[in-house]
Curated annotation (Swiss-Prot):
Annotated source species: Hirudo medicinalis
Family, as annotated: Belongs to the protease inhibitor I14 (hirudin) family.
Name assigned to this protein: Hirudin-2'
SS bonds (residue pairs): 6-14, 16-28, 22-39
Residue list for modification Sulfotyrosine: 63
Glycosylation sites: 45
Length: 65
């Protein structure tokens, strides 16, 4: 299983769907159009990434440091 994750708080690189939240000590606030999600500090859990059409792409390694 792979997990989507959030980058640093405040960056627009949340890879979550619906009301699911990301790990790394951040949670996701969804944008109104689904494309302006933001990471904010807060409790969160990793979200299992599905393998269906329309999946989010994995975050590049440089964002996970």
């Amino acid at each position: 299983i792979t997990y989507t994750d959030c980058t640093e708080s405040g960056q627009d690189l949340c890879l979550c769907e619906g009301s699911d939240v990301c790990g790394k000590g951040n949670k996701c606030i969804l944008g109104s159009n689904g494309e302006e999600n933001q990471c904010v500090t807060g409790e969160g859990t990793p979200k299992p990434q599905s393998h269906n059409d329309g999946d989010f792409e994995e975050i590049p390694e440089e964002y996970l440091q």
